[in-house]
A protein has these predicted regions:
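Domain-level marker for long, solvent-exposed, non-transmembrane regions
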Residues: 17-281
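Positively charged n-region of N-terminal signal peptides that target proteins for export
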Residues: 1-5
Length: 281
């Protein structure tokens, strides 16, 4: 029953993003999840207690503001936990994973309790104070990404360096773009790419755990002018069209395109360095 509730909440949250110009950002009434910039931001508000007349009125006002700020921050933390639970990890929500593993749940709750303040405190017209808190997805990934199944750190650079260095700079491929603008794809922290024969083209075994945590396997953007494109895949990426996204999280490309990516990986180490980006609607 719990899993059904989480799935429903995740579905409702994604509805906020469907018509948004930035569908890599899932917005709710309590904040947003930004898969492109790998950050989760929550917001909390609280009423400012009316000023009381007193000989020491100034100190009373300071005390009241302090209480209101504390209440707003507490609400923002509660909202943050709710947002974290609907983050799409790999087709599973973080909340589903927490429900299955009490240790993971405790670690994530600790992470949420250490969320940092995002921006300045806002003082609203209706006598309210608002505070935003943020958690980086790298912190969430540190907890959720398994230690096993990834490329060994020691061999992650050795296989392609000679080939890349012997290729003229003008001919080097700098990254891979998967164009998913014609299909429905839900962003995730660790999605995979398969070909039409259901063979894995890109997944944890292609990159190290540290890169998965710190960089994320894939970037997201909505057009080629987005600054994330240059930062993630450089100036000369190859562009591959996604065929489908049957489970809405993992992407499928053609067999021919999967061979092109494998060849580019052997020569330039694009997958090893997580130089992969998905274009969304």
């Amino acid at each position: 029953m719990y899993n059904y509730v989480l799935t429903y909440l995740f579905f409702i949250a994604t509805l906020f993003a469907i018509d948004s110009p930035r569908s890599s950002v899932v917005r709710t009434g309590s904040g947003f999840i930004d898969y492109s910039n790998r950050v989760i931001v929550s917001r909390g508000t609280a009423s400012i207690i009316p000023k009381e007349k007193s000989r020491d009125g100034f100190k009373v006002i300071e005390k009241n503001l302090k209480i209101s700020k504390g209440e707003a921050k507490s609400q923002a933390r509660d909202n943050m936990l709710g947002l974290v639970k609907i983050v799409n990890f790999d087709g599973r929500t973080v909340g589903e994973i927490m429900h299955e593993d009490p240790l993971t749940q405790r670690r994530i709750e600790t992470l949420v309790s250490s969320a940092y303040q995002q921006g300045e405190i806002e003082y609203l017209e209706r006598q309210e104070v608002a505070i935003a808190l943020a958690v980086k997805m790298s912190g969430l990934a540190e907890i959720l990404v398994d230690a096993g199944g990834h490329l060994n750190e020691d061999v992650s650079q050795s296989t392609f360096l000679m080939t890349r260095n012997s290729t003229p700079k003008s001919e080097r491929v700098s990254g891979v773009i998967i164009d998913a603008r014609n299909i429905y794809h839900v962003p995730a922290m660790v999605p995979k790419i398969f070909n039409e024969e259901d063979k894995l083209v890109y997944g944890p075994r292609h990159y190290t755990r540290s890169r998965s945590i710190n960089r994320g396997p894939m970037g997201y953007a909505h057009n080629m002018d987005d600054g994330n494109v240059r930062r993630r895949v450089g100036k000369n990426p190859i562009i591959i069209e996604a065929v489908t996204s049957e489970d809405n999280t993992n992407l499928t490309i053609s067999k021919i395109d999967s061979d092109i990516i494998r060849d580019a990986e052997k020569r330039f180490g694009l997958l090893t360095n997580c130089k992969v980006l998905v274009l969304l609607k």
